[in-house]
Regions:
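Conserved catalytic core of the tyrosine transesterase superfamily
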Residues: 1-190
Length: 190
């Protein structure tokens, strides 16, 4: 299995938003929900309208860990959710399948949605459902959130695991190698 990457470039994130919004509002909201909450796709897909309606946070038992978690709903995400669920019934899945009346879309459908959008906007990196979670973590870190806090949000065993997961280890390695200069060390010849 190939490792998937976060979407590091903000322009590409906005391109994904624009593309998905033009294709299908459900898919747009799925993308937004993922990059604004950092939830695993398995947890996003099991959400129902009642889980987010008039709420400031999502309370759930994580599918992978079995632990109870509370995830705040970001202020930029709230109006997107309000518009999306307007007129919908509380018991409906948030991201319901068009083929099955009372089922959510599958993980495979979510993967396909993200990959079609990524290719359409020119993203060359490996993209998958974990890309949403990794993008959330990467940009939270870029905006000053500590690895310690992200470790807790992601329920990781260490900050090193979190750094590797959100892709900042590779960024640091790349910057370090690009910054290497024997001339700047003062002893090299020009």
């Amino acid at each position: 299995m190939n490792t998937v990457e976060p979407i590091r470039d903000m322009d590409l994130i906005f391109d994904m938003m624009d593309f998905l919004k033009g294709q299908n509002v459900r898919d747009y909201v799925l993308f937004m929900f993922g990059i604004y909450t950092g939830l695993r796709i398995s947890d996003i897909l099991k959400l129902r309208v009642r889980d987010v309606k008039e709420k400031d946070a999502v309370y759930m038992r994580e599918k992978k860990t079995g632990k109870e978690k509370r995830f705040a709903i970001n202020d930029e995400l709230k109006p997107v959710i309000v518009d999306f669920i307007r007129g919908r019934r509380d018991f409906e899945y948030l991201f319901k399948s068009p083929n099955f009346p009372n089922k959510p879309i599958s993980r495979q459908q979510a993967y396909n949605i993200l990959n079609v959008a990524a290719r359409a906007v020119g993203i060359k990196d490996n993209i998958g459902t974990h890309t949403l979670r990794k993008t959330f973590g990467y940009h939270m870190h870029q905006q000053g959130v500590s690895l310690a806090t992200l470790k807790e949000i992601f329920n990781h065993s260490s900050e090193a695991v979190t750094a590797r997961y959100i892709g900042i280890n590779q960024d640091i390695q790349d910057m370090s190698i690009k910054g290497l200069s024997y001339h700047k060390a003062g002893r090299g010849r020009k």
